[in-house]
Regions:
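C-terminal lobe helix-coil module of Hanks-type protein kinase domains
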Residues: 1-33
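Protein kinase-like catalytic domain
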Residues: 8-11, 121, 152, 171, ...
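Regulatory extensions appended to serine/threonine kinase catalytic cores
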Residues: 31-47
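A short glycine-rich, aromatic-capped structural motif
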Residues: 61-126, 139-142, 219-220, 227
């Protein structure tokens, strides 16, 4: 009744408003529900990249009182070795592309330098001797093997040349592209010394950018000897990362390109077979691996 009377007041100013009517209709003690608390501001959590493999671990080997050898330990993994059939500059020597599993091993952060070679062997056979931090060259595969044997005696560890699979695994550093930095050859000068920027000589190791695993000069500067003998293709190649060895085969694998050659030779999959194990040339050097390997 009070509601009706309030609405029928003759004086318009005294008539009840709609809000007054609503208030009168509510039960005694009723209150409108409280507004929900504002949603807390979203907290942005840092996004951690998911590594393809565990992080490589560096360590330093002492060769003499003044000369050391920097190594990088790589975890076991698997990768696609060689060039795909669709590769525009691939040749039959780099096929078929195949999956390879590799055990953990440590590899040199840089190619062996002239200072390191001389500290171990007592001589420097290199042509380009303007800087002791240049990679050693004019070393044969046999010379590289002798260095590894003597370094093993000095350190008490097993040092050797990388297998071809280990070398490509380390070079690619998780990539599947032409180069370990991508497919664009115009970027090669940031990562490698090759015919387009070398002025036809070697340069100190580590002057260019490394690959994703912190390895320098995997492309360019000097070709690097591998443990394996030469084969014309990857047909029947080992899938366990071991060296592919043949008795009485005197041609060995070289990888990585050099200061003398064009970008095609610096591709991660490129294989060079021009040299017998006893030949020396100013294009050829090596880097070492620490870890047990298979022997024939």
């Amino acid at each position: 009744k009070p509601i009706i009377e309030g609405c029928l007041q003759k004086d318009r100013k005294q008539r009840w408003t709609a809000q007054q009517v609503l208030n009168a209709l509510q039960p005694v003690g009723w209150n409108s529900p409280p507004s929900p608390p504002p949603a807390p501001a979203a907290v942005k959590k840092p996004v951690s990249p998911i590594p393809l493999i565990a992080s490589p671990t560096p360590f330093t080997e002492k060769i003499s009182n003044v000369v050391t050898l920097e190594m990088v330990s790589l975890p076991a993994g698997q990768f696609l070795m060689g060039s795909p059939d669709s590769g525009p500059d691939a040749d039959k020597y780099q096929k078929p592309q195949h999956q390879v599993k590799v055990n953990s091993f440590a590899i040199g952060k840089y190619p062996v330098t002239q200072a390191q070679y001389e500290a171990v062997m007592g001589t420097n056979p290199s042509k380009f001797q303007n800087n002791p931090q240049n990679p050693v060259e004019q070393v044969s595969w046999n010379d590289a093997q002798a260095f590894c044997r003597k370094l093993s005696q000095i350190t008490g560890k097993t040092y050797r040349l990388p297998t071809e699979a280990e070398w490509e695994y380390a070079c690619r550093a998780g990539t599947t592209t032409r180069y370990y930095f991508g497919d664009d050859a115009s970027q090669l000068g940031d990562y490698a010394w090759y015919d387009g920027n070398s002025r036809y000589k070697t340069h100190p190791v580590g002057d260019k950018k490394p690959n994703a695993w912190g390895l320098y000069d995997m492309s360019g500067n000097v070709f690097e000897w591998c443990e394996d003998n030469w084969h014309d293709s990857y047909e029947n190649a080992p899938r366990d990362g071991s060296a592919w060895l043949i008795r009485d085969n005197h041609f060995q694998i070289l990888r990585g390109g050099s200061w003398y050659y064009n970008p095609n030779y610096c591709r991660s999959a490129y294989r060079n077979y021009y040299f017998r194990r006893d030949l020396t040339y100013d294009l050829n050097g090596f880097r070492v691996v620490c870890g047990a390997g298979r022997t024939l």
